[in-house]
Amino acid sequence: METKAKNRFINSITLPHYEFTIKSPAFKKEGEEFTIWFLEGILEKNPNYVDCLMYLGNAYTAHGMYEKGLQIDQRLCSLRPKDPILYYNLACSHALLKNIDAAFDALEKAILLGYNDIHHLERDKDLTYLRKDVRYRKLVEKIKQH
């Protein structure tokens, strides 16, 4: 009986309507720019919030901020050193910055940790620059053997 009373109370709450204008330039951001600002704000209070870091890394990369994306990916790999997806993302960040040796090191680590999505690997535009290197085919063959 008490639960019904609580539910009835919650359903009958009416919040007041306020009209106001936010003049802060931060709230004038849109799209990826707003997303980045918002996620950075969350990380100020929770610097090791992995899901937030993952979204922020993706947002940086989508916005062409590859150096910042790389820093996030490195941080994520230190927080979760056994996650193959994080090393795959690290490889992508290095590849976008044309850090070829570092990209191959991270990609090899991802594969050693269990990354095996050849379909995605072969189509990922972030890795385009790596496909010209003989090491790329060797890593693909390594995945196929497992």
List where the protein language model places each region.
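Long, contiguous interaction/recruitment modules in multidomain scaffold/adaptor proteins
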Residues: 1-34, 145-146
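Alpha-helical adaptor scaffolds
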Residues: 20-29, 35-98
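TPR/TPR-like alpha-solenoid helical repeat scaffolds
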Residues: 21-29, 117-142
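Conserved positions within tetratricopeptide repeat
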Residues: 36, 70, 104, 131, ...
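A short structural micro-motif
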Residues: 59-62, 127-128, 146
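TPR/TPR-like (Sel1-like) alpha-helical repeat modules
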Residues: 101-118, 140-146
